[in-house]
Amino acid sequence: QGNYYSYGGTTPGTPIGCTNLITLSNVKFFASSSSDGPDIPVLNSTDYWCSEFNWKNQSLTVDLGFVTFFDRLLVQGEPFTSRSVSEYFVLTSIDGINYTYILGTNGQSMKFVGPLFNGDQTRDTNLTAPVQARYVQFNPQEPMIAEDDSICMRVGVESCQLVPAAVNGAWSHWSPYGPCTHACLGTAKRTRTCADPAPVFGGSPCEGVNEEEKICNDCVGTVNGGWSPWGLWSRCSTTCNPGQRSRQRTCTNPSPKNGGTDCSGPSTQSEPCQVQFCPVDGGWSAWSGLSRCTRACGGGRQYQSRTCSNPFPGHGGRDCVGVRSLSFTCNTQCCPVHGGWSPWGSFSSCTRTCGGGQKSRTRVCNSPAPSCNGITCPGGNQDIQPCNQQTCPTSPSTSFPINGNYSNWGQWTACSVTCGQGTRERTRLCDNPAPAQGGSQCQGPSSELVGCTEIPCPVNGNWSSWGDWSNCSSGCGPGKSYRYRDCDNPAPANNGLNCTGPDQESKDCNSTACPVDGGWSAWSSTPCSATCGQGTLKRTRECNNPKPQYGGASCFGNETEQEVACNKGPCPTSPPTISPPTTGSPADSNIPELDLVFAVSATSSNRLATYNSMRDTINRFITTYGSNKVHYSIIVYGKAVQRVISFNHTFPPSVGELQEAISRHAPISGPTVLKNALQETQTIFQEIPSRPNAKKVLVVFTDSNSPSDGNLVQAVRPLENNKILVVSVGVGDVNRTELLTISPNPLDVLSVQPTAGPGALSKRIMDRILRRDIPLIDIGFALSATSSDFQDIFVKMKNVIRTIVERYGVERVKFSLIVYGQNVTTVLGDFNRNLTQADLVNYVNNLQRVPQNKNLDSALLEAESLFRQRARPNSKKVFVVLTDGVSTLSNANSLLINTAELRKSDVLILSVGFGSQTNQVGNQMNSVVFAPRDYIAVPNYPAERDVVIAETIMFKALEVNLPLIDLTFALSSSSILSQETFKLMKETVQSLVHTYGIDRIHYGVIVFGSVATRSFDFATNFPDQNELIRKVSQLTRSGGSPDLVAALKEARKVFQLKEVRPYARKVLVVMIDDESSANKNDLNEEVRALRNRSVLVIGVGIGTQTLPKDLGIITDDKRNTLKAGINKNRDELAREIISIILRPSGLSKWSSWSACSKTCRYLGKAGTQIRTRDCKIPELGCDGMRIDTVECNKMDCEGCGQRGPLNESAYTASSNSESPAFLAALNTSDPTAWCLINNENGGYVQLDLGELTRVYKVATKGEQQGDRWVTSYYLTLSEDGETFFDYKAAQRLSGNTDSTSVAFNVVNTTRPYRYVRFHPVNFKGEPCMQAAVFGCNEEKILPPPETIADQADAAKGILIVLWILAGILTFLLLMACCYYCCWHVCCGRGKKRKGLVYRERSIEDDGYLINDEKRWTLGSAPMTPVPRVREDEIQEVTIEMKEDNEQPLGVIQFGIETDETKEKHVTAEDVKSEKPKYSEEASSGTIKSGSTMMRMKANDGSDRRKRTKSEGDAIDAVDGDLDWSYLSDEQGTAFTNEAFVKSQEQFLEPPGSASFRGNKVDMRRSLSADELATLDYDLFEDRQGPLHTATLGRDGYMRMHKANQGSLPPSDGGREMGTVDVAIGGIRVPNSPKDDPIYDTAGQEIHLAVEQAGRSVYPLEDGGYRGEEWYSRWG
């Protein structure tokens, strides 16, 4: 019965008597996730299951259909591949809810072993005891190969013994009879099942039938009613926020007859709906209290702030208007300065020379002088003392000495300085008397200085000392620390200069690296422990991916695991016979014959480690692939070359002998001379010829570069000529450039570290040798050689193709061959054809050139047909053009169209140019290839190696079919779920790298929080995508609130790098999970800087804490924003990002910004700058903006802005007011306001603006102290203060939501007013308000002043120009009159007719479009059959309005002139149309000949229309017509190009239909500001049906169609006719009868009896399309 055990390997065979419990009649499979399947993945089936998400809990569950016993499990992998499962657990369940693991003998969850290396190998496990269950869940843990993350299974569940006794099946009870099939003589059925019980364990099935019928309904004549299918859902009752929609059905399927019952149930269903959230405009919070003054005196500052959080703006609502913070001066009084005395001056001369005199001295209170209420100096300013007390003589003596004495002091001089502290001086003379007869000189100074004080001098500011450093911004890893200083030492005063230099410094901090947790390397297996008698395989792994560092956790789990039994065959008991030694292992059975040379060099400073790595890899390679089919030669080289072992094809060495030989040999020292190794390899292959069918390979191992290239090109050429493949392995820090010389395909150069696992590396080497790591490729070649060197070039082309065939074989790569010149010859056109490699080479050798001029268009069309019809379903498709000159029979436009058709089939197009015309070929190929790098120029083709060209082609062929993209990610994760969100961000980046590679997309990453850090950018070189993925996995979050401005600034620097590729698409993806605190203005500035550099910004919000406004600001299109939950699948999010990047693939580059349209903001509207781009390749998709606008010159014009400040007398109010009207002046710091009492009907507050003003905005605020405000109000306006007009028919404007914030409303007036009244309607508490008006003066804004002479000269010049223009216009008018008289009168061509114009032709006319500026939005135009209409005639349509009078509002005329000279795709630029004319001519009641009037019932108010005039026409409206001149914001928003983006595909048939075509560029037309706007326009609605849906935009278009002669037979009710259709998005059939006089359509019914509807599309020569559409309808 077999060997039973709880854990082990494959049994010798299938146990006897096993029953398969998985049958097609009872089986059900379901899985946790699937990339393939699950379908029915049973053993030996083509169905299989592969897990999509590998996270240790993936599972495949089989429902056996009943509870049973099983004791044997079997698994396989994906058929025909190596994708399988090496380990898995099994869980079982009785009820499908509670699952338990199958346990081993140790009581732990049993680990089952799957097949190794082969998806078709069956691996079974027998259990020691049967398990009872209905549900069996397989929980795979690891794939077959560690580097392959695919988990794929096919399963079997069997019962071999201990099976319960057989259970025979028994029928269940009969079900009730079902409904009768017909109203008369129908049948009814009932059924039963064989499930009570079901047959199991070999039991017999039920006997008898499982279905019975009986006759029912004997036709008594009654018919019960039946419901029709539900109709379409109506539109949502609201345009935003929750509403209701409904649908209906009727009791007509069938209708009740002859007393039959009516239908039961409702005829109407309704359900909630929501088109979108209503926009929520942001509102300011209350101002915070004033902060403390920064200075006690001398002028300080106080601050208060508010936030835009009451409410936060949402769903596209406007941000708050105004400033977030205010500052005020405080304590401006000067600081007190107390006075201080100057030093005493010198004593004066004594007043007498004898007899007792006095002398004095003074001081001044100026050191400093008292100021700002400072205390004056204490004490006196003069000191007097006696002097010369001696007695005077009684008589004079001539010899008595006369001492000198000073005269009085002179006047003080002026102060020595103009500001601050200075001095003044005065002097005296010694002449009162002068000294004589030996008398003494005057005592004391002759001059005196005193202080003086002028105005204060300016004080320049000076910095205080730096403050302390702040804490580091990150806990580990690089961070920033900051410190600050203030400009207060001293603070600048008296107009002094401010401090220079920054007030902030930063420094790097936290040099301690963040902990890095260890990660396991891939498993690597050891050789079997025994060659016979059953050994075991072990596998090991290392904790080095990455190694734990800086305190990080070590890896969890075991380093070594026992694997499965191996070499279980019995050991031989008799001596072996004499034969060549055993050389191989079973593992090499699926590989071809290989003659393989290993060249090993280890000469670096780390040569011991690198050489051991190389030697271990070679040993593992030999162990894995054996030596039967692979024969080996090994050389070791450095400065010299030594052979370790040579080929021996007769008796090849055994695995052990090979391993012993390489293990014994040491590395050779000295410089690495790679040229010598290449020459030795060539010698080895010459000495010992290779086996006939063996592939020749050289694998080079090196850990350093050669001192010089040593002419490697010449050394490797003989190897290439001998068809030897060279694979290079650089171990350690080896420059790849040298290795790329000998291995031209970058995929053939492997860069690894010495710690790389030998098992994984040996597999990578074999994958490159056999090219089995590439996908299925269908590659087509188109060859053309017509230059003077065509013979040599054509041979070169064939050599290149032959090299690709020889290197890549014919298993995974299939070929087609086209040769073209003026004609196209398809030599090989079926990718599904199975050819041998020799057959394919023979096809290439026999290719014959096609002469004459090149017609590349024909080759592209032939290729498109081949790939569409003959390509394999899952293959990568590549088309390569090989040419030596330009295609003279093709133009850029036709090439664009034909290559676009190829790209629709997902074909990557490459081109190779040979010879002297490579530059010209490259210019033409810009219309063919996706990016310039897809063109390969080979000007010096004789010198270029065939292998280099061939491998360059194949390397590019393996790239993804994408344009070049320079892609930067800015990641910020600071929410409460930051770990989960940052993990999703990193995994999304990794998914992009894994899916799309690093060749066509270059990457950069910025991580930001409160600061932005660039982790890597386009200048960072990554050897392969695995290294980049590893780099992304090591990213760490940045702390703090996300500063979007800092992130965008850093991104701007990234896109300024010289490494940004000129032809690459530049993309920034911002991923955040929290609200940003960035200033909106700063953010807009950075966004514009990126847009100026043509950077596409995509915003991705992760989680629930991001605000839509943050993402909306940074993107120029709301479709460029994504929202993702934390459980979003990473691959799906990556695909959504790529789809946004590729959406506008067919658009050209943006043009430069235009000049600003205005020099300043007028009427609240700033100027605009415009840039445009064209739809270069429509078939690739042009789903993006064509026109981009930005605001510019936002400063208000002179004379524009808030009116005021107004005098108190300018504010007046209605009589019943409780407060003065002047309190209505808007003042955010004033807590009072004007209030209206008793809610007076029509009460108001009036503002006299003092002059006529064009008002464009009003603002209101509530009363803060009473917490009262107005929530809605309306306006009236007047020019003279007597006659007031309601603004917009007294439409209510939104007021305030609190008492503190200011609410603004934009208004649109067409004339100036002086008086504005605010009428409160709804309010909170009491109707209290402050108000302000914004407007512009009516006077003309004058240019800068000029001199009188300049003005006079300018005026003369203008008059001359005007006279010339007047003469030209007069001449043109005379010519027009002559034309009219001759053509319309004399020739009889002037009669007007009903209908639109078309020219008489024998084929259908094209559709014509009306120009934007000349189109009008008529709802429906009557269509009148006429025999003939002239080209230049016009149609007039009058629409009658039923208001308070019987007169129509006007007549609208338009006309079209056509061009008969050529059949072409006509666009708006080719149509010459009259400008719409507005006429009051119809007021008289007379209708022009040929016009049609649409009349309406006077009592039918619901169907009446209003048509409002455009702004240009409304200037002449009377006062009462104010309402007609207003264009609402909602209409202005709808009439943009973006409105059509959502609807453009609705004009087309589904993609699967034969008439499907790409985006129809010529129907992109939007309304202009000069057109009529429509209000209350509900009579005609959108036509329902596949061509026009409810989401259709307002895209006016006109079609004209002329039926062919006899195309509508009279027998079918048809007749020759013309049709017109002028519509906004299509017209639905009116509900009223066709003869209702409201339409005036009697006698105008049109029958199209041939077909009900249809569409035809014809391509035109210039690349456009001509489309026709027809349908039948009333009138």
Swiss-Prot record:
GO terms for cellular component: membrane. Residues 1378-1675 are cytoplasmic. InterPro entries: Compl_asym_regulator, FA58C, Galactose-bd-like_sf, TSP1_rpt, TSP1_rpt_sf, VWF_A, vWFA_dom_sf. Its main location: membrane. Pfam families: F5_F8_type_C, TSP_1, VWA. Component of the acid-insoluble and acid-soluble organic matrix of the aragonitic skeleton (at protein level). It is a single-pass membrane protein. PANTHER family: PROPERDIN. This is Coadhesin. The lineage of its organism: Eukaryota, Metazoa, Cnidaria, Anthozoa, Hexacorallia.
